[in-house]
Amino acid sequence: MPDAQLGDKDLDDEYITDAWLVDQHVGNVLFSWGDNYAGCLGDGTTTDRSSPVQVGTLVNWKQVSAGYQYSVAIKNDGTLWSWGWNFFGQLGHGDTANRGSPVQVGSDSNWKQISIGYRTSLAIKTNGTLWGWGENDGGALGLGDTANRSNPVQVGTETNWKSVFSSGYYAWAIKNDGTLWSLGGFNNQGQLAQGDTTFRSSPVQVGSLTNWRHISEGMAIKTDGTLWAWGANSQGQLGLGDTVDRSSPVQVGTLTNWKNISAYGSTCQAIKTDGTLWAWGANSQGQLGLGDRTNRSSPVQVGTLSNWKQVGIGVQFTMAIKNDGTLWAWGGGFINNGQLGLGNTVNYSSPVQVGSLTNWKQVAGGDSHTLAITYREI
């Protein structure tokens, strides 16, 4: 199992604001598909789905994040909901019982952003506080220890956290002042970007810069549009043209037009400000979308289109949304449970459209399941 952030989850601010609700007549509908172990699709069953299935009847979903056989989401009212596998308490309900349908986490209504990786959950509230729960084997919750938590626990006392990215065995976050922090976790390949391979279980600042804007697994974009990478690199996932690990951030090329990135395990997908999509890293199942299964150690453009809006990576598969609201999928995984949503269990090495809808808003890939939000008139 790759030690990776499961799904996207690493949205820019423009994707996690109330601007999603264009007006009072538009609602956000949640769909899921793929592997349904422990009810992680949230449809009240454990039946795998190879095509999108609506989760309940509500139209107030704001952001979703998919992990290892579990799911977490935020509604427009700021409440937090989770479902699926819960062996490590990763659902945040104070127990280890699985849930087959969405259940509210506590009673707070001020959750802003959620990022779950493998079996570790991290979230930020509107007051800028950071919270963690679930598996903590590597100290990735940033709580100063390696004890699991089954309820959300505040990370430190700071109230200036802006965004967070959980990769399961390590995590990072950006503060409002633009500083980048590694929260903790295993660091045997320099994943914490501290210039060493020392294990940590509490937040430590990465360098001294104050211009970090967007974070994913071992990848980050600065406010100047430059892309930086660090950590494991056995599959060329750092995009530096080699397979050498890095324990400190290194710039990827010289371009200054990177907009957002989704890195998962050993695969990376990124969108530039011109709307083009670029991929690199592991490609054993065609997850780079380049028409083959050859790894790449430098960014390569996916097709020739310039209308990509958001991309989310799961385990050996990729989901992406275009500006026209269409949803596309490729890859599939060593085991394909229908996570591409194409009505079959076939792997694809080039983008294939999922259905015919043109109202997809956000997509998140997990271990072998996918969550996505559409909007519709209500």
What function would you assign to each model-found segment?
Residues 1-27, 31, 375-378:
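Enriched but not universal
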Residues 31-50, 84-101, 134-151, 183-201, ...:
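Short glycine/serine- and acidic-residue-enriched loop/turn motifs that recur at repeat junctions
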Residues 32, 70-73, 82, 120-123, ...:
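Conserved core positions of repeat-based scaffolds
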Residues 55-56, 105-106, 155-156, 206-207, ...:
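Surface loop/turn motifs at the tips and blade-to-blade linkers of beta-strand repeat domains
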Residues 59-63, 76-79, 88, 101, ...:
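Tandem repeat domain/solenoid detector
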Residues 347, 363-378:
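Blade-level signature of beta-propeller repeat domains, shared across WD40, Kelch, NHL, RCC1
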